[in-house]
Swiss-Prot record:
Keywords: Membrane, Transmembrane, Transmembrane helix. This is Uncharacterized protein YFR032C-B. The keyword Transmembrane applies. The chain crosses the membrane at residues 20-42. It comes from Saccharomyces cerevisiae (strain ATCC 204508 / S288c).
């Protein structure tokens, strides 16, 4: 009984590792790529996007800071594709 339970626990932990590690790696790599995109491309054209992304990433779950950045700039939000057309 103890041996079968240990075998079951080992199988469960292997399954958990095989799902958590790739998922974590995908999230981290996607976050890094998204940060690179937002810092290099968007923030150079439009500081509003830079503030939105960084207020989301620095403290997720707070919309007060996000709203304050929106009202502070008072810039019409454009799609990311033509963010440079406002300047």
């Amino acid at each position: 009984m103890v041996a079968s339970r240990a075998r079951e626990n080992q199988r469960y932990s292997q399954c958990r590792k095989s799902t958590i590690f790739p998922l974590g790696f995908a999230i981290i790599s996607g976050y890094i790529q998204f940060q690179n995109i937002s810092i290099l491309h968007i923030s150079r054209f439009n500081p509003l996007f830079y503030n939105i992304f960084h207020s989301i990433f620095k403290n997720p779950g707070t919309t007060i800071q996000l709203e304050s950045t929106l009202y502070y700039h008072e810039v019409p939000i454009s799609p990311i594709g033509n963010a440079g057309s406002q300047i």
